[in-house]
A protein has these predicted regions:
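Alpha-helix initiation and N-capping motif
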Residues: 19, 49, 93-94, 108, ...
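Short, well-ordered coil↔helix boundary/capping segments
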Residues: 68-71, 75, 87, 105, ...
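C-terminal, well-folded lobe of enzymatic/effector domains
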Residues: 104-181
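Intrinsically disordered, low-complexity N-proximal targeting/linker segments that flank membranes
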Residues: 1-53, 60
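Short conserved micro-motifs at the rims of enzyme active sites and ligand-binding pockets
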Residues: 61-64, 90-95, 126-127, 158
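Histidine-centered nuclease catalytic patch
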Residues: 42-76, 92
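C-terminal, helix-dominated tail/subdomain
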Residues: 1, 101-106
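Short Cys/His-centered divalent metal-binding micro-motifs
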Residues: 73, 77-102
Length: 181
């Protein structure tokens, strides 16, 4: 058995076990809150609940003609508090990162560490005036990182799919990740 990263493209349903499992794996890896930099914990924020939110905001993606199939995928989502999500709003990542750094007094290095804790390459979010091609680079990079994490946790190898393989042909059921998490 192997883990096919194309499966991640199909995870868009918030109630699906596999969708939740990927978010849980990112939490388990020690992701930190985008605004405070504090360790993310589903139960520690009380009035500021943790949920899975967009990294490239939905509004930004819609304005740039990116399909919902891509922007609503778990690849473009990560655990964030409600206040972090509100601060991000619909701005491009480079803009909301600057806003968070300014308001919270975070250095770029500290913010980059937060992004890396979410399996995000900071350089891919810091692109000034990002384009669809920049979103695509971010998306493919994060998909590879999430696939590597899922494969490591399950003990499976990451499959390198051929171009003709479709996500519906994936042999491995990501729902099994929930049991491993």
């Amino acid at each position: 058995l192997s883990f096919n990263p194309l499966r991640l493209d199909t995870l868009r349903n918030r109630i699906a076990a596999a969708y939740k499992a990927i978010g849980a794996l990112v939490l388990r890896e020690g992701c930190r809150d985008f605004v405070t930099g504090a360790p993310a914990d589903l139960y520690a924020f009380g009035a500021d609940p943790m949920d899975i939110h967009h990294i490239f905001p939905r509004d930004w993606c819609r304005r740039h003609g990116i399909s919902a199939d891509r922007y609503d995928s778990i690849v473009n989502k990560t655990p964030l508090t409600a206040s972090s999500n509100r601060m991000i709003g619909g701005a491009a990542p480079c803009d909301y990162l600057a806003l968070v750094e300014g308001r919270q007094g975070l250095s770029a290095e500290a913010m980059d560490a937060v992004l890396r804790s979410h399996l995000i390459d900071p350089a891919l979010l810091r692109v000034s005036s990002p384009t669809v091609a920049d979103f695509d680079r971010f998306y493919e990079d994060r998909k590879a990182r999430l696939a590597t994490l899922a494969a490591r946790v399950t003990g499976l190898a990451v499959e390198v799919p051929s171009p003709e393989v479709q996500a519906t042909e994936v042999e491995f059921d990501l729902d099994d990740v929930e049991e491993a998490a």
